[in-house]
UniProtKB/Swiss-Prot annotation:
GO terms for molecular function: identical protein binding; N2-acetyl-L-ornithine:2-oxoglutarate 5-aminotransferase activity; pyridoxal phosphate binding. Pathway: Amino-acid biosynthesis; L-arginine biosynthesis; N(2)-acetyl-L-ornithine from L-glutamate: step 4/4. Belongs to the class-III pyridoxal-phosphate-dependent aminotransferase family. ArgD subfamily. It comes from Bordetella pertussis (strain Tohama I / ATCC BAA-589 / NCTC 13251). This is Acetylornithine aminotransferase 2. One of its GO terms (cellular component) is cytoplasm. PANTHER family: ACETYLORNITHINE AMINOTRANSFERASE, MITOCHONDRIAL, AMINOTRANSFERASE CLASS III. The keyword Amino-acid biosynthesis applies.
Length: 396
């Protein structure tokens, strides 16, 4: 079937898409309508924890679909209870509210913090966030984000999100006032170019929050669920946040997110928060399967081996092509280029024949890599070899 035969005009135009339609996927590979295969190092922007169509997920979904799909969040269901127990047992948090997307989880975190401020800090509502941070595309989460240009898009913004600089504790300290209720950040700024927070900064934020009696919120929508080398990124900084959000990897490809909080922060009253599909057993059962897979013996050790392979490979390419190095945490990494030809490299990689390569360029001079956590050694080596050839072709 030719691309022109697909009625793509029925879809609302929100981004520039290439002329291809993906029809199937397996592991680290996708196949389009013409039968061409692509090695996928985007994986839905770090969504597909176990790759495409993971057997563990398919099995969990099929078994749950045969039992119960959505009785309404007004009632308890077993998979959501099981997943909540797993998440709290593996973290510093006591309670979980399930949602459907990262933006929805972050909206919940904002609401919970503001409610806590009303109860405990005389109505304090401001949440300090970071320049170049990304927290979602609802009005509140766009306002919380620090992407250039978003301060005027869909204006007026939701008020109450002063911006500090990541890894600059003084910039945070200068913004704290009587109306401040929390500080919120991504442990690794993904859209900004894969910029990790430093250990000193994260620990400084925790200390600053304690000194001023405010909350410390980590947005682990992209960094959580094994992506950065530990189950949750905050665990590598030796800090205890008050609130954490998860999405992307927790569902492994299906819409699932979570808002986690310590007991003393859980101030929602009945009716303060909700959602038609939140914590439905179908998605929660898949979340249990994803959690159990990545916490099984040997899984994270294998992912860490692929992290070393990716980091070393990117450093070798950087040295060969006189680039500016690589950075990141775990299997969320970036190759920093010496010029703004990342979009051209992404395009050339996708156009490779007979098999393409899918990469991401959040900045003109930067490539981001977000493979499945169970990517094979062979597929990692293949990607690095293909990328070397693409750089050569683009820069010839």
């Amino acid at each position: 079937m030719e691309f022109s035969q697909f009625k793509v005009n029925a879809l609302m135009e929100i981004t520039a898409r290439p002329d291809l339609v993906f029809v199937r996927g397996q592991g680290s590979w996708l196949e389009d309508h013409a039968g061409k295969r692509y090695l996928d190092f985007v994986q839905g922007w770090a969504v597909n924890t176990l790759g495409h169509c993971a057997p563990e997920m398919k099995r969990a979904m099929a078994e749950q679909a045969d039992k119960l799909m959505n009785p309404s969040p007004a009632f308890y269901n077993l998979p959501s209870i099981e997943l909540a127990q797993r998440l709290t047992s593996a973290s510093c948090f006591d309670r979980v509210f399930f949602a459907n997307s990262g933006a929805e989880a972050n909206e919940g975190a904002i609401k919970l913090a503001r409610k806590w401020g009303r109860v405990n800090r005389n109505g304090a509502y401001k949440i300090i966030t970071m320049n170049h941070g990304f927290h979602g595309r609802t009005l509140a989460t766009m306002s919380a984000s620090g992407k250039p240009g978003w301060d005027t898009m869909f204006a007026p913004q939701v008020e109450g999100f002063p911006k500090a600089e990541i890894n600059d504790l003084d910039s945070v300290r200068a913004l704290i006032d009587a109306q401040t209720v929390a500080v919120m950040l991504e442990p690794v700024q993904g859209e900004a170019g894969v910029i990790p927070a430093t250990r000193e900064f994260m620990q400084g934020l925790r200390k600053l929050a304690d000194e001023h009696g405010i909350l410390f919120i980590v947005d682990e929508v992209q960094t959580g669920m094994g992506r950065t080398g530990s189950l949750f990124a905050y665990q590598q900084f030796d800090v205890i946040p008050d609130i954490m959000t998860l999405a992307k990897g927790i569902g492994g490809g299906i819409p699932l997110a979570a808002l986690l909080a310590r007991e003393e922060v859980c101030v929602f009253a009945h009716g303060d928060q909700g959602g038609t599909y939140n914590g439905n057993p179908l998605c929660a059962a898949v979340g249990v399967a994803v959690f159990d897979t990545i916490t099984a013996p040997g899984f994270m050790e294998a992912a860490q081996a692929r992290t070393r392979q990716l980091s070393e490979g990117l450093l070798a390419l950087s040295a060969k092509w006189s680039l500016r190095g690589e950075r990141g945490m775990g299997l969320l990494r970036a190759l920093v280029l010496d010029r703004d030809d990342a979009p051209a490299i992404v395009e050339a990689a996708r156009m490779l024949a007979p098999e393409g390569l899918l990469l991401n360029a959040p900045r003109g001079n930067l490539l981001r890599f977000m493979p499945a956590l169970n990517v094979t050694e062979a597929d990692m080596a293949r990607m690095l070899e293909q990328l070397d050839g693409v750089i050569a072709a683009v820069r010839k």
